Amino acid sequence: MVLVHVGYLVLPVFGSVRNRGAPFQRSQHPHATSCRHFHLGPPQPQQLAPDFPLAHPVQSQPGLSAHMAPAHQHSGALHQSLTPLPTLQFQDVTGPSFLPQALHQQYLLQQQLLEAQHRRLVSHPRRSQERVSVHPHRLHPSFDFGQLQTPQPRYLAEGTDWDLSVDAGLSPAQFQVRPIPQHYQHYLATPRMHHFPRNSSSTQMVVHEIRNYPYPQLHFLALQGLNPSRHTSAVRESYEELLQLEDRLGNVTRGAVQNTIERFTFPHKYKKRRPQDGKGKKDEGEESDTDEKCTICLSMLEDGEDVRRLPCMHLFHQLCVDQWLAMSKKCPICRVDIETQLGADS
């Protein structure tokens, strides 16, 4: 007796090795309930090559015939010899281990997400009141959700995890996993701040996506909203706060008023000093030791000009030094306050 694997069934074949590929017929046992027995007919005299390889066991889904299940058999003789098997309905088999591979992966992912949701709700019970349900089909206008045959994730009203539960009424054909569009996979990957889009619709979807992660920092960013206009509003609010602060403090200036300038300085008409006798006259255009210059405008002082002498004995044009003292009460050369210098001398 030789065991031949046909799909998920192990069928015994009586006879020699050379006759194990002979066609046979089977019929379902009339009294079969949980176990399924099959009657094998007598072997036929048809001969096959002795090196005929056995079919490897493969997993098949309900609804497929036995001659279609092992898709990688190495000879066409077995396909011709086997008669089509009747469709078997395994309605008494339940549990996630018998589901298709893609559905089983979704079941495991659902378990992980539910555990993370439970831990987050236990540690932060007040967050459930701040969350609003979101419809995934409104997140991105260009995404066609009809292309996916997998169960669509639904956003929980009291949590932040995707609900990957499977409806019982769906047929097995709807569980085929198809590749997700590339622009949607970008948002399912690890979020990076410099990859966030700037348009409002994409930004809203990113905000909803990062809520799936249990990190408190990402949840805080999701609550903040990541609104593109938030940066401009923050700048506008900061500027308005500065204006309000200026109104409360008034005009803060470090300069002196005109009365203080007139009180602590000495304005007069400039009179140029003459050179002493016995010293040779210098050529016209050359500066002498007696020439004085205003260090603010860098112009030479001429006779009859209005000048102002500070308590530190530095001399400037009146117009130049008045504008300076209106902004700062310190001398432009020695940086001494005009009021402090006067008090020290007196």
From Swiss-Prot:
UniProt region (Disordered), positions on chain: 23-76, 267-288
Catalytic activities: S-ubiquitinyl-[E2 ubiquitin-conjugating enzyme]-L-cysteine + [acceptor protein]-L-lysine = [E2 ubiquitin-conjugating enzyme]-L-cysteine + N(6)-ubiquitinyl-[acceptor protein]-L-lysine
- Tell me one GO molecular function of this protein: ubiquitin protein ligase activity
Q: Give the intrachain disulfide bonds.
A: none
Gene Ontology annotations for the cellular component aspect, listed alphabetically: nucleus; protein-containing complex
* Top class in the EC scheme: transferase
Zn finger regions (RING-type) covering which residues?
294-335
Identify the residues that bind Zn(2+).
294, 297, 317, 320
Q: Where is this region: Ubiquitin binding?
A: 266-268, 309-313
Q: Which UniProt keywords apply?
A: Metal-binding, Nucleus, Transferase, Ubl conjugation pathway, Zinc, Zinc-finger
Q: Where is the composition biased (Basic and acidic residues)?
A: 275-284
The answer, when asked if Chaperone is one of the entry's keywords, is: no
Q: Does the keyword S-adenosyl-L-methionine apply?
A: no
Q: Name the Pfam families on file.
A: zf-RING_2
Description of how activity is regulated: Binds free ubiquitin non-covalently via its RING-type zinc finger. Ubiquitin-binding leads to enhance the E3 ubiquitin-protein ligase activity by stabilizing the ubiquitin-conjugating enzyme E2 (donor ubiquitin) in the 'closed' conformation and activating ubiquitin transfer.
InterPro entries hit by this protein = MBR1/2-like (IPR045191), Znf_RING (IPR001841), Znf_RING-CH (IPR011016), Znf_RING/FYVE/PHD (IPR013083)
Q: Name one GO biological process term.
A: muscle structure development
UniProt-annotated location(s) = Nucleus
Q: What does this protein do?
A: E3 ubiquitin-protein ligase that acts as a regulator of motor axon elongation. Required for efficient motor axon extension in the dorsal forelimb by enhancing the transcriptional responses of the SMAD1/SMAD5/SMAD8 effectors, which are activated downstream of BMP. Acts by mediating ubiquitination and degradation of SMAD inhibitors such as SMAD6, SMAD7, SKI and SNON isoform of SKIL.
- Domain comment text? The RING-type zinc finger mediates the E3 ubiquitin-protein ligase activity and binds directly to free ubiquitin. Non-covalent ubiquitin-binding stabilizes the ubiquitin-conjugating enzyme E2 (donor ubiquitin) in the 'closed' conformation and stimulates ubiquitin transfer.
Protein family (similarity comment): Belongs to the Arkadia family.
How this chain assembles, per its entry, is: Monomer; binding to the ubiquitin-conjugating enzyme E2 does not trigger homodimerization.
Query: What protein is this chain from?
Result: E3 ubiquitin-protein ligase ARK2C
The organism encoding this protein is Homo sapiens (Human)
